[in-house]
Amino acid sequence: MLRAFEYRLYPNKEQVELINKHIGSARFIYNIGLEVNNSSNENKTTPFDRNDLIKQIPGLKKDVEWLKEINSQSLQAPIKNLDNAFKRFRRKTSGYPKFKSKWSGKQSFHIPQNIYFDDGKLSIPKFREGIKIELHRAIKGAIKFATISRRPTGKYYVSIVYDTGVGRKPKPPIKAETTIGIDLGIKDFMVSSEGDKVNNPRYLKNNESKLKYTQRKYSKK
């Protein structure tokens, strides 16, 4: 079963700069993917090709020098997020994807793997020195992925998703020999398939005539 905990980060000046570059790259790649899709798919009916865009990232890194400082898998994550946004749009559970703005409240980037804790610090790719973390709760399980975010207050947090290794408790099977059917009615409140009856509560008895009158009244309309 997957669970998630969020922790406060205390990056130094150099780490803040690199975190902000990762956040900017996530927004940059997402917007480029959306722009490429919009320009080649004006009628918005062609499925989004996430794999094709991911293949173009190495070439993009040659043209945009600072992208070389970013973890390669963190560069792929925005394309996958955009793909999920298009899937929700096709299922009509959300609107058409919009371009991301650096002025929006919460900014973040995704780290799919190679996430460790060492001596009170968070170790992730591209960060030579671990980031100081307030590890207020131990993680008992295998780390699956992490998301580092910057809040409007300027504070940084990391959300760690991990697998507890414990599956959800299955529901007990329904046995035919222990199952009965129940009918609800006006005369008798409840009648089981075995013939047992439960009388109506007093408040329902007192209002039975009103219920019948109302039923006849609206059945004529």
List PLM regions with ranges.
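Nucleic-acid substrate recognition interfaces
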Residues: 1-221
